[in-house]
Amino acid sequence: MRDGQARYLALGGAIGLALCVAQPRATRAQDWSGNAEGSTTDGPTVEQYMKDAGPNLKFFAYGSLKIDGKLVNCGKRPTVMNPNFDSWGGAFPGFLILNSKKIEGLSTQVKLYIYSHECGHQFEGPDETKADLFAIRRGVKWGWLDAQGMEDICTFISQLKGDSVHPPGPQRCETMRKYYQELIEAGTQQAGSSSPYDTQAQTLGPAQ
């Protein structure tokens, strides 16, 4: 534990501004729209986060979270629902964060995109494009992403402005849309399965 007062920093996805919440450990939350500070390699444990992040949190062990009735997982990583989180979602090493209030009005496929984008940061680090493509690849492979869902994601992401670490929302939309079309045209639901982060059956395998 580091001495002195420190902060968790979340980049507000909708407005692209950094919002700070006082916490006892100096680190940064990887919000779903990205952060170049390497928060997937340093941060609190889920126990520390649950203790320090305030009231109304809800913990979901891996394999227990459902989004609109659909069971989701990010390997063996748990998820914390935090209705007061500054963005739609976030990630520290080993666990994900979703803002239950912010995602409430979104379509199912956009919610799954946000969750999968955060999961992508666990494997890909802070790179925005890689996390976006991880989410699209997972959506195609796992069968929850269709053409309408891709358009919903684009509508949602296109409102975001770019900054030093975020490509502009419309650019992200086009990158994801192009990749989605490539996956569909390739006729494979197993795109990228040779990559270690895509060969995931962790919830069916033995605990380590």
Regions found by a protein language model. Give the residues of each.
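Active-site scaffold of zinc-dependent metalloenzymes
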Residues: 80-107, 119-122
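Bacterial N-terminal signal peptides
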Residues: 12-20
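Short alpha-helical catalytic segment bearing the HExxH-like zincin motif
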Residues: 110-118
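Sec/Tat signal peptide C-region and signal peptidase I cleavage site
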Residues: 23-29
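Catalytic Zn2+-binding segment of zinc metalloproteases
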Residues: 118-130, 142-144
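Bacterial N-terminal signal peptides that target proteins for export
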Residues: 2-12
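Auxiliary, metal-adjacent structural segments of Zn-dependent hydrolase domains
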Residues: 31, 36-92
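Long, well-structured alpha-helical subdomains associated
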Residues: 144-208
